[in-house]
């Protein structure tokens, strides 16, 4: 563990097309191996596909992120030789990061022909509270509910 203290949170510059920090973070999470231009094409392509079907793509993205973001998660805690799954509340920044990660992971597993179409379909599903990312959130909440008895082990 570091003795120097925590590093300050880095600011993310808003993306050039929509001027949104959320979309800039989303692009950074889609990015693989430092290929930001590819990630931008994927996200902007998905936003264009959504724009054809829905009027406001940014609102739909925000709604999808709100629907997918978890309120509680479980963390492993070792107490006297036994490991308990302790439910803990998720802070806002992690909530958004988890929502983005789950949306991207579940969109990569979809069957559509291209990544922008996969991402657009997953975002549309998530905004209507269905799809793989919503299943992941429900599963996380179920785990927390099942282990509610260990909530007093929070730290």
Curated annotation (Swiss-Prot):
Q: Which organism is it from?
A: Xylella fastidiosa (strain 9a5c)
Q: Which InterPro entries match?
A: Ribosomal_uS7, Ribosomal_uS7_bac/org-type, Ribosomal_uS7_CS, Ribosomal_uS7_dom, Ribosomal_uS7_dom_sf
User: What GO molecular function terms would the record report?
Assistant: rRNA binding; structural constituent of ribosome; tRNA binding
Biological process annotations from GO: translation
Enumerate the PROSITE patterns for this protein: RIBOSOMAL_S7
GO cellular component term, pick one: small ribosomal subunit
Q: What is this protein called?
A: Small ribosomal subunit protein uS7
* Family, as annotated: Belongs to the universal ribosomal protein uS7 family.
Q: Which Gene3D superfamilies match?
A: Ribosomal protein S7 domain (1.10.455.10)
Alphabetized UniProt keyword annotations: Ribonucleoprotein, Ribosomal protein, RNA-binding, rRNA-binding, tRNA-binding
Question: Would the keyword Ribosomal protein turn up in this protein's UniProt record?
Answer: yes
For whether the record's keyword set contains Transferase, the answer is no
What Pfam families has UniProt attached to this entry? Ribosomal_S7 (PF00177)
Q: How does it assemble?
A: Part of the 30S ribosomal subunit. Contacts proteins S9 and S11.
**Role of this protein:** One of the primary rRNA binding proteins, it binds directly to 16S rRNA where it nucleates assembly of the head domain of the 30S subunit. Is located at the subunit interface close to the decoding center, probably blocks exit of the E-site tRNA.
């Amino acid at each position: 563990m570091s003795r120097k203290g925590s590093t300050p949170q880095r600011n993310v510059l808003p993306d050039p097309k929509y001027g949104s920090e959320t979309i800039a973070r989303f692009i950074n999470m889609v990015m693989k191996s430092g290929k930001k231009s590819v990630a931008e094409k994927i996200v902007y392509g998905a936003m264009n596909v959504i724009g054809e079907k829905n009027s406001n793509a940014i609102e739909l993205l925000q709604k999808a992120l709100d629907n997918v973001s978890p309120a509680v998660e479980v963390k492993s805690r070792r107490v006297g030789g036994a490991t308990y799954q302790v439910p803990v509340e998720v802070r806002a920044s992690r909530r958004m990061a988890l929502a983005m990660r789950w949306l991207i992971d579940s969109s990569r597993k979809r069957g559509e022909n291209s990544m922008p179409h996969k991402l657009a379909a997953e975002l549309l599903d998530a905004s209507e509270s269905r799809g793989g990312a919503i299943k992941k959130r429900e599963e996380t909440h179920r785990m927390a509910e099942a282990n509610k008895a260990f909530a007093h082990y929070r730290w």
